[in-house]
Amino acid sequence: MEVLMAERANLVFHNKAIDGTAMKRLISRLIEHFGMAYTSHILDQVKTLGFQQATATSISLGIDDLLTIPSKGWLVQDAEQQSLILEKHHQYGNVHAVEKLRQSIEIWYATSEYLRQEMNPNFRMTDPFNPVHIMSFSGARGNASQVHQLVGMRGLMSDPQGQMIDLPIQSNLREGLSLTEYIISCYGARKGVVDTAVRTSDAGYLTRRLVEVVQHIVVRRTDCGTARGISVSPRNGIMPERIFSQTLIGRVLADDIYMGSRCIATRNQAIGIGLVNRFITFRAQPISIRTPFTCRSTSWICRLCYGRSPTHGDLVELGEAVGIIAGQSIGEPGTQLTLRTFHTGGVFTGGTAEHVRAPSNGKIKFNEDLVHPTRTRHGHPAFLCSIDLYVTIESEDILHNVNIPPKSLLLVQNDQYVESEQVIAEIRAGISTLNFKEKVRKHIYSDSDGEMHWSTDVYHAPEFTYGNVHLLPKTSHLWILLGGPCRSSLVYLSIHKDQDQMNAHSLSGKRRYTSNLSVTNDQARQKLFSSDFYGQKEDRIPDYSDLNRIICTGQYNLVYSPILHGNSALLSKRRRNKFIIPLHSIQELENELMPCSGISIEIPVNGIFRRNSILAYFDDPRYRRKSSGIIKYGTIETHSVIKKEDLIEYRGVKEFRPKYQMKVDRFFFIPEEVHILPGSSSLMVRNNSIVGVDTQITLNLRSRVGGLVRVERKKKRIELKIFSGDIHFPGETDKISRHTGVLIPPGTGKRNSKEYKKVQNWIYVQRITPSKKRFFVLVRPVVTYEITDGINLGTLFPPDPLQERDNVQLRIVNYILYGNGKPIRGISDTSIQLVRTCLVLNWNQDKKSSSCEEARASFVEIRTNGLIRHFLKINLVKSPISYIGKRNDPSGSGLLSDNGSDCTNINPFSAIYSYSKAKIQQSLNQPQGTIHTLLNRNKECQSLIILSAANCSRMEPFKDVKYHSVIKESIKKDPLIPIRNSLGPLGTCLPIENFYSSYHLITHNQILVTKYLQLDNLKQTFQVIKLKYYLMDENGKIFNPDPCRNIILNPFNLNWSFLHHYYCAETSKIISLGQFICENVCIAKNGPPLKSGQVILVQVDSIVIRSAKPYLATPGATVHGHYGETLYEGDTLVTFIYEKSRSGDITQGLPKVEQVLEVRSIDSISMNLEKRVEGWNKCIPRILGIPWGFLIGAELTIAQSRISLVNKIQQVYRSQGVQIHNRHIEIIVRQITSKVLISEDGMSNVFSPGELIGLLRAERMGRALEEAICYRVVLLGITRASLNTQSFISEASFQETARVLAKAALRGRIDWLKGLKENVVLGGVIPVGTGFKGLVHPSKQHNNIPLETKKTNLFEGEMRDILFHHRKLFDSCLSKKFHDIPEQSFIGFNDS
């Protein structure tokens, strides 16, 4: 005691609170100095002191001790304000759902963390002896984050899936939770009693599995004689000293350590604190230590490889059951881990980035060429710099240079004024070692019914080419235009005026109009009507009987006609994009039997005509043949000059043959009968024989004409032709007979020894040689066709009086459908058309404007005076930007009457089919409307824009719009483009000034010409009125829409938003029809803010907007559904894929340990590992030759994966402050990595492929057999490792008892009872315990060791050289692949 007193006088007094960690350090120092007994004596005194003090203090805890932090109120208010702004941005479509989620999480997380940090200083100042404050530090129960929930705020919770619930709990437990908050906290809080119980059972099961793997590992020897070790390096300061010393203390050195030439530590020396400190100060070379990994034995471990026993600081005793200790020391902290709270909310804790702040106030400048715009992960605009960027901040007197590292985000613009400490850049956090990233899908669902539009191109995902999954290539908005299919008989608001073309949009063919209501409004007379219909969805021809009623109210004249859902049930008169005009013409008078023919007007599927396209064709019945034959153009080739440019490829629907344009007035058709028979059929006639009419050719085929039979055998079929005509055996003198295949005009004399006669008609001479010596001539009859030129077109298409140039021209061209000498085959009694009269579309090229390359055509139906007329409308398209259409309205001068008798000399093309009232029942009406022509003052250009779908509407010119002067000048220069930059087509998001540059629409004093067609006198009356409105084609982009697209929406069940506006001269916002407008865009001066939507109607003083909801989507998002599709509330719109950092938090910690130990893939590293394993297994044998190759490849792979597994498990525990010695984890990892899988190739007779054996056993067997055994490394999980041990009794007592025992019995396995568990099961003595060493015979040991060491040393030497040779290779691999290992710098392989 006196000694103690004497020492006490010299001791230093530390006035510090001592906590758990300090206490641990103190005890370990005490044991170092004084030994165990003395230390326990000292600790007893400390304990007594503590109990005395605690009794005296008498801490009590009442609800009054919970003091709320005063700053909480405004902090929460601030966070709420931020999330409100965020919500607004989301509504405007500026940020998408994932960005919103991230940002709100960060807002609330920051608030909650700030409160937590404020808590302690606050307590310290106001009430330092507050029991809550004291308890939160004691470490006994409760910690800062739990107290924070009592007095701070609970903040964000996460649901059982670990997803964040973005409704923060703002109250703390002192203030009391609201009902919602209570439910959320029950849902997401993982601190319930149940949870603890579940976690405890998990940890218990983990312990059981761990012990199962390693229960047989016992310390059996002092030294296994290995020369290998793992090198740990203290240099670079990369590894924290604490971890470094923890790794080293208690280990045994595998090699001597030199400082220069002086040896400071020898091999097999245990490392204590002093030695570690010396290493740290000297920064010596890498230190090679022995670990359980390097121990040479399979089923036990030696004292030196294990190191010191953690209980009493000496080398571990022989007979110590270190396996069970290891299993328990890993599993037991699991129960501690589970009791940790879920304080961070689980997600997004690793997502905070470092900020660069401005050093002083000033103007910021940087080189804009080095950055490109991007979005931050919160959706804010920013610049991304790809290389180092120097930013200069100019304050009044000084220049500051700030260097911004690559891959950083710049949050300010060039020349912007920044204040001191303002965040100017965000540095992307490097790859954080602690947090694994995982990809999460987030689905966005629609809030309302509506029609989907998007404002950019989308790609189809390749595997869903025909599905509805689209990938977005760039950031864009998706719009849901409100308004669903109409289900009820509501009173709708109509915004259509007289003669507008519109769709009735019913889902079925029946609709009844019940009542007409007329309402007077201040603006104008709005017509309201109600309609109900039955939602029958079958495709059937509707009953049109009640559709003739025209509903009139005042001056409005609205006629509705239904359109069927889909095109399957259309009447035969109108096929898809094809219109046939029946023509009862000349032929019908001559021959009643000929089928009636008609003009077919065909529009390509996409509705676009190129120059010289064929618009319509007429198949003249005179040029129709029933039989097969051959076409010839004439006797001499000059008749058939075919110029290249006159060859027009016909882009039809059915036929794809080229057409030959004829410059000649006649051609010839040589008939023949052709039968194509299968190769197996038996013919009843021979080649070159002559048959009569109706001769039997095969069993079920008879000839139609008589004549000469020719049989040609092709590969799989027989072609049999019958030529009618005369057979002529020529004499020596006949000249003509030398020619073959010539046409002879009439009047040519033909001499013969027997007869002489004049040829009456054209004939065709063909020479036939049945054998070498004989030949004869076949004279075949020829049918001659004359082709007459078309009638002059000028009279048929009266030129448009208002049109002065850029006229669309139509010319008639006759095409022969078959080339010269082409055989024609008739298939089963169909008639063959030889000549087709075609109407070719062409137009003048305008020199000033860009040439029109394509024209868009469609059919329009107009009802005038109770009759329905079809018009063909053709617009020319100048270029994608300016939409200047050309009008072609061939309102015919020759209308056909029904009997067709007076139409004999009218060219068929001038007629446009018109219906009488009686025919309305049969016809299927298209949407109705009118064609309007726009002219400008100088009559220089016009456009034809039709109001086609109900989503479009009219637009009026704006009065007193202040144009920019630039635009005025451009109008003067180029008066040809009055409509600038296109009228925005529907479905295209025309830019809005706040986001992008604005598109302008300019009109000046145009007049509208409406053409009324009156059927009674067939006069064209023009009515010139002041321009009232524009109409706009839905397909501003000149693509024909999908034919079923305009079916579903009812145009009136929409939400309208009316806005009267007087333009702000400042913003000079010019609205184009079909433009999408976001909510926060100011359009009107002092007008109310708009709802988001699409402009569908523009009047002089107001616009009508169809409400729409924007959703922002970023690249890589998947869009579900098709463009224009109707969606219902709750349908999935978009799926985002985003990365979130998985929490390093411990509630996910225990499962994470389990994942690592069961070797389930937790992130991409496992994939890399497997590839590396394969790579090593391939390249090492190549370097080293076969025998050593597999072994070394396997060894290196195993060593690498072992270290990585140990580090991963340690990370989880260390992040929670739980200390576990590495060697425990190493023993477990060694067991799950010590097996190899015998592979198929090189099958040896020892092991069967697919068998799992120990690595060392494979190595020994290979050496004994002196042949290579092919195997590859496997990582077994702990469960699989438990089921693959030496002992079947231990396996059976773990899992799958029946299976294991049955297999063992069948295989005749022997259990040597080496482990603990087998002996416990059978009630034997367990072969462990520190008194066990007396049983081992010393003589045996001595005999065994030298032999083994010789062999291994030989091997070790080779291995060492190889390893040093490949050390560099390894290091590079390591740094690349294992980026998540914090100790990467000091791991090498050392085999000294």
UniProtKB/Swiss-Prot annotation:
Superkingdom, natural source: Eukaryota
Compartments (UniProt record): Plastid, Chloroplast
Source organism (scientific name): Solanum lycopersicum
Keyword Metal-binding assigned: yes
Cofactor note: Binds 1 Zn(2+) ion per subunit.
CDD domains documented for this protein: RNAP_beta'_C
UniProt family annotation: Belongs to the RNA polymerase beta' chain family. RpoC2 subfamily.
Pfam families in the record: RNA_pol_Rpb1_4, RNA_pol_Rpb1_5
One GO process term, biological-process aspect: DNA-templated transcription
Name of the protein: DNA-directed RNA polymerase subunit beta''
InterPro entries documented for this protein: DNA-dir_RpoC2_beta_pp, RNA_pol_beta''_euk, RNA_pol_Rpb1_3_sf, RNA_pol_Rpb1_4, RNA_pol_Rpb1_5, Rpb1_funnel_sf
Residue stretches spanning the membrane: none
Keywords from the named record: Chloroplast, DNA-directed RNA polymerase, Metal-binding, Nucleotidyltransferase, Plastid, Transcription, Transferase, Zinc
GO CC annotation terms, alphabetical: chloroplast; DNA-directed RNA polymerase complex; mitochondrion
Binding site for Zn(2+): C224, C295, C302, C305
Class of the enzyme per the UniProt entry, highest EC level: transferase
UniProt-listed Enzyme Commission number(s): 2.7.7.6
Reaction catalyzed: RNA(n) + a ribonucleoside 5'-triphosphate = RNA(n+1) + diphosphate
SUPFAM superfamilies in UniProt: beta and beta-prime subunits of DNA dependent RNA-polymerase
Subunit structure: In plastids the minimal PEP RNA polymerase catalytic core is composed of four subunits: alpha, beta, beta', and beta''. When a (nuclear-encoded) sigma factor is associated with the core the holoenzyme is formed, which can initiate transcription.
Gene Ontology MF terms in the entry: DNA binding; DNA-directed RNA polymerase activity; zinc ion binding
Function recorded in the entry: DNA-dependent RNA polymerase catalyzes the transcription of DNA into RNA using the four ribonucleoside triphosphates as substrates.
Cofactor(s) the protein requires to work: Zn(2+)
